[in-house]
Amino acid sequence: MMKMKINVDKSLIKAVKTGKVIVGANRTIDAAANGSAKMVVLASNCPEDIKKKIQATDIPVLEYEGTSVELGPVCGKPFTIAAMAILDVGESDILAATA
């Protein structure tokens, strides 16, 4: 099976604009634990304790190559984002990033 190559930044922007996402470690952990998240995106510098809590769930995890300082602006936010949950992808193809 061939893995589809997508532009992660563009896909994240589209998910933020057309879907439903939540940001913040605690809210992301909760969404992963209760199954409402379709996918979790973790910045490369996300703290290990947060990564472990999220990876203990069955939710697909995308490890973003950039840091939290880079992930925030990609998502159109004026702050850092270490962890975010995608509840509804909208018109984005972001789920293909973990396929």
UniProtKB/Swiss-Prot annotation:
The keyword Ribonucleoprotein applies. GO terms for cellular component: cytosolic large ribosomal subunit. Belongs to the eukaryotic ribosomal protein eL30 family. NCBIfam families: PRK01018.1 (NF002172). Pfam families: Ribosomal_L7Ae. Keywords: Ribonucleoprotein, Ribosomal protein. PROSITE patterns: RIBOSOMAL_L30E_2 (PS00993). GO terms for biological process: translation. It comes from Methanosarcina acetivorans (strain ATCC 35395 / DSM 2834 / JCM 12185 / C2A). It comes from the Archaea. InterPro entries: Ribosomal_eL30, Ribosomal_eL30-like, Ribosomal_eL30-like_sf, Ribosomal_eL30_CS, Ribosomal_eL8/eL30/eS12/Gad45. The keyword Chaperone does not apply. PANTHER family: RIBOSOMAL PROTEIN L30 (PTHR11449). This is Large ribosomal subunit protein eL30. One of its GO terms (molecular function) is structural constituent of ribosome.
